A protein has these predicted regions:
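Membrane-lumen/periplasm interface segments of specific transmembrane helices
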Residues: 34-49, 53, 58, 200-209, ...
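Short hydrophobic/aromatic helix or loop-helix immediately within or flanking a transmembrane segment
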Residues: 61-75, 83-105, 263-270
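Loop-to-helix entry region of an early transmembrane alpha helix in multi-pass inner-membrane enzymes
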Residues: 84-85, 90, 94, 98, ...
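Transmembrane-helix motifs of polytopic, lipid-linked glycan transferases
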Residues: 101-102, 112-132, 295-298
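Transmembrane-helix signature of polytopic, membrane-embedded enzymes
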Residues: 126-147, 311
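Short acidic/glycine- and proline-prone juxtamembrane loop motifs at membrane-interface regions
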Residues: 156-162, 330-331
Length: 382
């Protein structure tokens, strides 16, 4: 009898898998259309301005540092006497430069790694949306995420695409109870960016809940809680050992002008902007994104978003709002916080298809224009 039921259910499982694969393909196609269009706009703008599109996409701002690490390893320091600042490449985590080096090095290799990671991230974001809200909302979640103001970064030789991919699949594994997969990907996320600690926080907090609240003391749960933060901690300790200072990594960050001041710097910039001081377009966009992120965070809590996604997103918000320096880059720091878009995707999934398409197309167009502005006109890093 059991064998008969299993045989009967096999075709159903096959159909479900095919349906999931088709929907994931639609999500990936939507992502490719939105971000491919954005890259085309940047490339055309670069040609018009007499710039090399590959260098604009693969060698701008932080990309220079990642490519330098990939080519020559760590040890580069740049001093700016005018501002009395020292910039060390130890501020940048090692996984992305390592992958660029393994791919051959240079801007093209950087873009190959980033675009591959961005595609993996899009499918991971879709799977989370599908799991929680259904296939249509999952596709819309990906399209919304690809249409964010700073989503141009997903097509640059930056670490955000890699972090988003590792975070999305780690969180998906965690939601499915695959502890070791979730922890392993979280450890890799911790080797990608400082904010990779958010993925580790999600895995560790959920593991603690299993251990302390639900009484689940399975070895995989213990291992996940210990493994998840290992990547982030190992790099921070390695920099500390190199500089003969346990807090050496945070010293490097302060020398870059980045530190955690519990939101003092953010509030100061917001106050100056709102009190009538000169406000640039990047500052205006940042203010709008931070306000929207705060509102969406409240919506996520009210919608009873699963604990792993809440912890992950809350950690990103604390780091972004609480950090001083690089105010105009805060929307980029929130780019991995895709769970904030779940309530919006759910609402759009209930709307008419024509409305959802129109909203997404409008947001994508704005993202294309702003992305080109950031890379070709703005004087601050994206």
């Amino acid at each position: 009898m059991d064998a008969t039921r299993q045989a009967a259910s096999a075709p159903g499982r096959t159909r479900r898998r095919r349906g999931t694969a088709r929907s994931a393909g639609v999500a990936l196609g939507a992502f490719a259309a939105v971000r491919g269009g954005g890259a085309l706009v940047v490339a055309l703008g670069a040609w018009w301005a007499g710039k090399d599109p590959v260098k604009v996409l693969g060698g701008s701002w932080d990309s220079f540092w990642y490519l330098s690490i990939a080519a020559r390893g760590y040890g580069r320091t740049q001093m700016w006497p005018a501002s009395d600042s020292i910039q060390s490449d130890y501020a940048f985590f090692p996984l992305y430069p390592l992958l660029v080096d393994l791919t051959g090095g240079g801007p093209v290799a950087g873009l190959v790694v980033s675009w591959t990671a961005a595609a993996a991230a899009a499918v991971g974001v879709y799977r989370i949306g599908e799991l929680l809200l259904g296939a249509r909302a999952g596709v819309l979640l990906v399209a919304l995420w690809a249409s964010l103001p700073h989503a141009v970064v997903l097509g640059l030789a930056y670490t955000e695409p890699l972090l988003c991919a590792l975070a999305a699949w780690s969180l998906y594994a965690l939601l499915r109870g695959r502890w070791l997969w979730a922890a392993s990907l979280a450890a890799l996320a911790g080797l990608t960016r400082p904010t990779g600690i958010a993925v580790a926080a999600a895995v560790t907090v959920v593991a603690l809940r299993e251990l302390l609240v639900r009484g689940n003391r399975a070895p995989a749960v213990w291992a996940a809680g210990l493994l998840a933060p290992a990547g982030w901690a190992s790099y921070v300790m390695a920099v500390g050992a190199h500089r003969h200072d346990p807090l050496g990594y945070f010293t490097v960050q302060r020398q870059w002008g980045s530190r955690f001041d519990f939101g003092g710097g953010t509030l100061e910039t917001v106050w100056k902007a709102l009190s009538g001081g000169p406000v640039t377009l990047p500052v205006t966009v940042t203010l709008a994104v931070l306000a929207a992120a705060g509102l969406l965070a409240v919506a996520a809590v009210l919608d009873r978003t699963p604990l792993p996604l809440l912890v992950y997103t809350a950690t990103l918000l604390v780091i972004t709002f609480g950090g001083a320096g690089f105010f105009e880059s805060k929307p980029r720091f929130l780019l991995p916080a895709f769970p904030l878009l779940l309530p919006v995707a759910a609402a759009m999934a209930r709307a008419r298809p024509r409305t959802a398409v129109a909203v997404t197309a409008g947001l994508a167009g704005l993202s294309w224009g702003y992305g080109a502005y950031l890379l070709l006109i703005a004087t601050v890093p994206p």
